[in-house]
Amino acid sequence: MIKFRLLLFVCGIYWSVGALAQQDPMFTNYHFNSLAFNPAYAGSNEHLTLNLSHRQQWLGLDGAPVTQALNAHSPLRNERVGIGFSLLNDKIGPGGTTDLAGSYAYRMQVGASKKLKLSLGLQASMANWRGNFSEITVEHSDDPSFSQNISRWLPNFGAGAYLYGEKYYLGLSCPRLLEHDLRKTNQDTEALFAKNYRNIYLSGGAAIPLRDDQLVFRPSFLLQSAGFLSNLKDRSSGQKIGAPTSVNLGAAFLIRQLIWTGASYRTALSGKSSHDSANLWMAWSLRNGMRFGAAYDITLSKIRKASSNSFEIMLGYEFDIKVKQVTSPRYF
């Protein structure tokens, strides 16, 4: 059983006090997981790509987030069209979400250059959200907020845009446009309620060759805003609920087209964030198409007093990688 005070401490990081206002899970190695937040990325690698990730947030903290993601995407015979598939499983405290999504992207050339492309993507998804509140030990067992478990099926759709060339990219997306009230309609209006938020993503980066393609410098950023254009407010204070807008600023080096090594800094642009961290990561791309990666996040917020740091592992496979490495190296 999860103790009530500890649970509120953990959930308050991802959710807001007075409500369970959920935001999307995060990945430090988001460069290899872009389909999870932008459907326009589907097919942009020019070949079938698979990626599996596992993230353990705040080691040693009971109820801390644990996330797994499986992504696959590929262009079709019509090179303008890409399709993708993603499966996400996220567990935090007494709640959990399993999300299945399919993506469709259409790409077009921009201007006279054949190297600059704009991809527009759509996504349809179905998620199962579970709130196992009976796991929580509370002082008053008759509290209606914790008297029953909840399971909801949540259909959704999303959209995104992805502008990219050989040496830079820029993306804007909202993978889940609809916001769902996760309470049952017959619940007491003053009881603890839950709602998932619309998340907006802005991403960008560049590849700067230092020694031809033998050493490439890649700066990048990912901005995430939860609750954008939302009117959800705390019922007691009347204040708007939502996680602060966060940004991940990173820099990486690609060595001999095989080894990635990088670092990033994650923080909030407004308000306080428990996600503040300094992150280190590496990835190895084998010539047979396999890719392995790992990331370690050093917690910088006050939560470091109650938990250890976070880690992430990744396994990927890219088909026909030998041909693509020779003709058109990919940096994003």
Regions found by a protein language model. Give the residues of each.
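Bacterial N-terminal signal peptides that target proteins for export
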Residues: M1-L7
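Short helix-onset patch at the extreme N-terminus, typifying the N->h transition
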Residues: L7-L8, F27
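N-terminal signal peptide c-region/cleavage motif recognized by signal peptidases
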Residues: S16-V17
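Subset of outer-membrane beta-barrel
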Residues: Q22-F332
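Absolute protein N-terminus
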Residues: M1, A21-Q22
